[in-house]
UniProtKB/Swiss-Prot annotation:
Residues 71-80 have a biased composition (Basic residues). GO terms for cellular component: membrane. The modification Phosphoserine is found at S58, S60, S69. It comes from the Eukaryota. The chain crosses the membrane at residues 10-30. This is Small integral membrane protein 13.
Length: 91
């Protein structure tokens, strides 16, 4: 009697462990193959370690990083300056 109850509990616990292990492995593979490519998801999770998707930065990621490229800001101001001067009243 106690042998069958123990065996039932063992099978139940083993099944739960296998299901949890498969879920963790599935999320791990989904993260590394797909979700880690998105910068905002990495920031939400706080993953600052190995970022395999950053070896080839895309254009959108380089445009968002304004701290490393002050030339882009300067060129944008220079482009706006002639347009603004034409509308200002001379004093």
């Amino acid at each position: 009697m106690w042998h069958s109850v123990g065996l039932t509990l063992l099978v139940f616990v083993a099944t739960l462990l296998i299901v949890l292990l498969l879920m963790v492995c599935g999320w791990y593979f989904v993260w590394h193959l797909f979700l880690s490519k998105f910068k905002f998801l990495r920031e939400l999770v706080g993953d600052t370690g190995s970022q395999e998707g950053d070896h080839e930065p895309s254009g959108s990621e380089t445009e968002e990083d304004t701290s490393s490229s002050p030339h882009r800001i300067r060129s944008a101001r220079q482009r706006r300056a002639p347009a603004d001067e034409g509308h200002r009243p001379l004093t």
